[in-house]
Amino acid sequence: MRYDVVIAGAGPTGLMLACELRLAGARTLVLERLAERVDFSKALGVHARTVELLDMRGLGRGFQAEAPKLRGGNFASLGVPLDFSSFDTRHPYALFVPQVRTETLLTGRALELGAELRRGHAVTALEQDADGVTVSVTGPEGPYEVECAYLVGCDGGGITVRKLLGIDFPGQDPHMFAVIADARFREELPHGEGMGPMRPYGVMRHDLRAWFAAFPLEPDVYRATVAFFDRPYADRRAPVTEEDVRAALTEVAGSDFGMHDVRWLSRLTDTSRQAERYRDGRVLLAGDACHIHLPAGGQGLNLGFQDAVNLGWKLGATIAGTAPPELLDTYEAERRPIAAGVLRNTRAQAVLIDPDPRYEGLRELMIELLHVPETNRYLAGLISALDVRYPMAGEHPLLGRRVPDLPLVTEDGTRQLSTYFHAARGVLLTLGCDQPLADEAAAWKDRVDLVAAEGVADPGSAVDGLTALLVRPDGYICWTAAPETGTDGLTDALRTWFGPPAM
């Protein structure tokens, strides 16, 4: 069987991409080198923009069930929470959702939609030509080959599709390394002054340029991290032992606090790298395969998730033959600068969490700035991805920005705009206007749904004064209309983002 798309990697990015591709009708195979799902969680939360996207695909309730809401974001553990409340969103918070649960929910959805998932199958080589990609795979029963139109590497920063392509991964080497343990502790952990709301327990050692921090994962289970900033770099892939963590805890905090019942051990660094390009012919990269960084502010999983939602509809339309030729190139053009911004802010956070006394003035200044509403909002927008704006033709300030989940007044009552995106199609929304939009957009009705609303239930929304919006499947506005503009530019926008009209 020839697949439309083969995805290497069954983490959150690969699984969400599989969901998006199946909604577009693409025959999709996911290959995961690990034979079994892991039972630990590297990432622990989803930010506001990711929650919005989950709502748009009908997955929001599953993620929000029993998930604590974190209403104050974290920047460099400076103790001043980021305020999401000024954004036009139904979700001014992050959700505490362990990655294991995220992957469980996304796996179930991908399989429900018809994606095929093979665990214990690793991509080992690839060859591509103008017609497709031949993927060499090693599975439990030996090597074999798979034919596909496109291959997407969502397999992380290690031995990956990116390396098989020979795509460079430039960036910055680490100046910090840490050991991590998810465990129980028999002794009371010290309360960490100045460690921030996300790290209520800890010890700061300016003399050692090191710190210990911990926060609760579940009753009596904590994630403990010990970080050093003046030690030789330790290979991130090197195994970590309980004794490594005990020794680090004792050196920095004076005790291992009776650590026991260890669930997970790992290490992290502030290595920061980004792929030189996200595409090579019929092979693309997404998630950690094209960007890695210090996991500060919980941005990594969300960055990859949003890569998947940006890429999925574009690749699906390309396979269906409805996309304009240049549509797939907009994936890298839009997402690479966003990832570069995340690398930039995590590099800044890496400096701010370094307990070197020389940086104390910088930390004090940053704390003062975080109390300035405009600065706080700017950083909250960065961390949550609520401020993302893609390059878009036109001058209206909403162009290229996410559409808020508006409560629409319709003939059937009030309905949230997000519910019209469950099928991952474009939406042409009219707001109480009599413009001949339906006739003009009729030739795209196989790709774009017309939603006629009388207006918005909440006054003072971001779309006040507009009579219509064209919104891409990923929720970003690509055309607007006002009474004075009529339908000017609608056909061009439809062609740009949804291809030529149907014959």
UniProtKB/Swiss-Prot annotation:
Q: Which InterPro entries match?
A: FAD-bd, FAD/NAD-bd_sf, RIFMO-like
**Catalytic activity annotated for this protein?**
anhydrotetracycline + NADPH + O2 + H(+) = 5a,11a-dehydrotetracycline + NADP(+) + H2O
Effect of loss of the gene: Mutants fail to produce oxytetracyline but instead synthesize novel polyketides of shorter chain length.
- List the EC numbers from the record: 1.14.13.38
A matching Pfam family: FAD_binding_3
Q: SUPFAM superfamilies, from UniProt? A: FAD/NAD(P)-binding domain
Outcome of substituting G14A = Lack of activity
Give GO MF terms, alphabetically.
anhydrotetracycline monooxygenase activity; FAD binding
Q: What GO biological process, any one, is recorded here? A: antibiotic biosynthetic process
Which enzyme type, at the first EC level? oxidoreductase
Cofactor(s) the protein needs: FAD
Q: Which UniProt keywords apply?
A: Antibiotic biosynthesis, FAD, Flavoprotein, NADP, Oxidoreductase
Entry coiled-coil feature ranges: none
Which biological pathway? Antibiotic biosynthesis; oxytetracycline biosynthesis
Q: Organism's domain of life?
A: Bacteria
Give the family, as the similarity comment puts it.
Answer: Belongs to the PheA/TfdB FAD monooxygenase family.
What's this protein's name?
Anhydrotetracycline monooxygenase
Q: Which organism is it from?
A: Streptomyces rimosus
